[in-house]
């Protein structure tokens, strides 16, 4: 499944970081895009909320959104990671944000880091679905979009206002946060 959307306009930023940059956003699912199915009493996927989030956040960046899968990251396989890697490789943009489930985000970051040089890739997600009013997703997406504009090429994880290199991050399941493995 692949859907493209273009969002953004000239924000009058002029010269400087990100002034002429287009950011590619790849949607892969995860808690970020889950919704509560009242009939089944479960969380499921209906559609991505990324475009709505960008509008709500009054984002003025030029972005191209592509939904490449809607998957719980616990169900993600090496084949899915290869699909994400191929999408990153084939896109023209050098600044990429990937929305991803938090359970295996670090594994995907590791897989991408093995294959990429010259592009800045930032993975982000949410602990609570955006469809729930208390989600951290909007903040995390905004943070990732900011980080991707200023970081050196490489692979990163951005969660809850912090940004980590792919090889120095873990999900602390007890605290429900991402943290550096070595400070």
Positions of PLM-derived features:
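Active-site histidine-anchored catalytic micro-motif
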Residues: 18-183
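Intrinsically disordered, low-complexity terminal tails and inter-domain linkers enriched
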Residues: 4-19
């Amino acid at each position: 499944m692949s859907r493209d959307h273009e969002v953004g306009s000239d924000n009058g930023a002029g010269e400087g970081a990100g002034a002429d940059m287009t950011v590619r956003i790849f949607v892969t699912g995860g808690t970020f895009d889950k919704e509560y199915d009242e009939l089944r009493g479960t969380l499921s996927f209906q559609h991505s909320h990324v475009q709505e989030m960008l509008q709500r956040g009054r984002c003025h960046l030029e972005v191209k959104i592509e939904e490449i899968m809607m998957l719980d990251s616990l169900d993600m396989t090496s084949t899915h990671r290869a699909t994400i890697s191929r999408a990153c490789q084939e896109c023209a943009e050098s600044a990429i944000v990937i929305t991803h489930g938090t359970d295996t985000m670090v594994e995907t970051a590791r897989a991408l880091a093995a294959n990429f040089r010259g592009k800045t890739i930032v993975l982000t997600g949410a602990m609570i679905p955006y469809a729930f009013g208390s989600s951290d997703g909007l903040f995390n997406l905004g943070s990732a979009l900011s980080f991707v504009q200023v970081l050196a090429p490489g692979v990163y994880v951005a969660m809850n206002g912090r940004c980590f290199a792919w090889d120095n991050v873990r999900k602390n399941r007890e605290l429900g946060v991402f943290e550096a493995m070595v400070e």
